[in-house]
C-alpha cells in the first residue's frame, strides 16, 4: 500500500484475469511491516492496522489464511484516522457472516460487509465530532485489505492506494492497482458534488478538500463527500509479491 491521502453483489467487484492461482497451503505466507513519515506536519495524522492473523473463529476451518490490513491518511488533524484505527477491523469482523460454512458463503456478501462497516465507522466518528465545540473538522481516507486464502479483497475511499507487484515473464515487476482514486475531478464524483450546489475549483471541493469520499470531514458532508467504498478483488498467483 502507498499512503496518500451478493451472487450479483460481487459483480460490482473487478478482478484481474490470472493464469496460475496458488493452490498449496504452504504458499500462504504473509509478512507484514509498516513505515510512516510525518513530513512537514506538526503532528502525525496517518494510522494503520496490521492483523496478519485476523481471527474469524475456529469454525472457519476452510480458511488457510485470513489477514486484515488498513491505512488511513488523515487530514485536518489526526482524530479521524485514529478513530478508524480503533474501530474499523472490529466493524468489519462483526459483519462477516457467522453462519458461513464454506468460502463461497463467507465471501458472497463482502461488498455489503465493507460498505456497512465504513458507514458505521463514519457515523460513529461524526457523532463523536458533534459532541465537541467547535465540531472537529478531521477527515481521513481509508483503504482496507482482507486476504482470504489466495484471494485479496480491497475496499477504499479517498486516494490511498493498494498495489500488488506481479512478476512478468521477463522478470520485471508490473503493478496491479486494487483501489479507485476518489477525487472531485472524476465525472461521477463531480456530478454528485455539483448537485449539492458546491463547485470544483483547482481539483478541490470549493477549493478546499481534494478527496470526494472520506471518513469524517463533517463540514463537507452536505457538499457531496460520502463514505461508500469501492471494492476490488484479485486472485493471487505464484508471480505475485
What is each model feature region?
Residues 1-241:
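PP2C/PPM-type serine/threonine phosphatase catalytic core
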